[in-house]
């Protein structure tokens, strides 16, 4: 791997489910996603019909750039994430808009993670 690398999110793998746009890029063993969600988006109305689970089963580590979202975990824990917040979400949650503006976040995962939902056996 080069000591200096760069890739544009414009060159990433694009996904566009209802009211969402996500671009995912990979640098070495780190995967990064930029996600933009439009007002009216919620996991339960826009993603649940696609994946068929009762809640989101992915873990997330990221930072909010714009907007605000409320998240409720299956265990009843709730919180709001807004611009400037770094966050961790364990699998088993729902999320929805609480602002009138688009929501933009960047998320990070690594093949080398040893915590949270990526803990190695």
Regions found by a protein language model. Give the residues of each.
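A generic structural signal for short beta-strands and their flanking turns/coil linkers
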Residues: 28-33, 39, 59-60, 65-67, ...
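Short acidic-glycine-tyrosine-enriched beta hairpin
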Residues: 73-93
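A short, N-terminal "cap"/entry segment at the start of jelly-roll beta-barrel domains
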Residues: 1-36, 44-45, 120-121
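Short beta-strand segments in beta-sandwich/barrel cores
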Residues: 42-43, 67-72, 95
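Conserved hydrophobic/aromatic beta-strand scaffold that supports enzyme active sites
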Residues: 24, 32-36, 61, 78, ...
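Glyoxalase I/VOC metalloenzyme domain signal
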Residues: 39, 110-121
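Glycine- and acidic-residue-biased ligand/ion/polar-headgroup-sensing regions
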Residues: 49-75
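Ligand-binding loop in jelly-roll beta-barrel domains
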Residues: 90-115
């Amino acid at each position: 791997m080069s000591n200096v690398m760069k890739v544009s999110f414009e060159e990433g793998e694009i996904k566009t489910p209802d009211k969402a746009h996500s671009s995912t890029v990979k640098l070495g063993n780190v995967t990064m996603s930029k996600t933009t969600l439009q007002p009216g988006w919620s996991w339960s109305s826009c993603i649940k019909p696609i994946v068929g689970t009762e809640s989101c089963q992915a873990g997330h580590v990221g930072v909010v750039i714009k907007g605000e979202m409320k998240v409720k975990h299956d265990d009843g824990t709730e919180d709001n994430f807004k611009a400037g917040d770094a966050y961790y979400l364990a699998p088993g949650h729902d999320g929805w808009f609480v602002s009138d503006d688009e929501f933009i976040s960047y998320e990070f995962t690594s093949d080398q993670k040893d915590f949270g939902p990526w803990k190695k056996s």
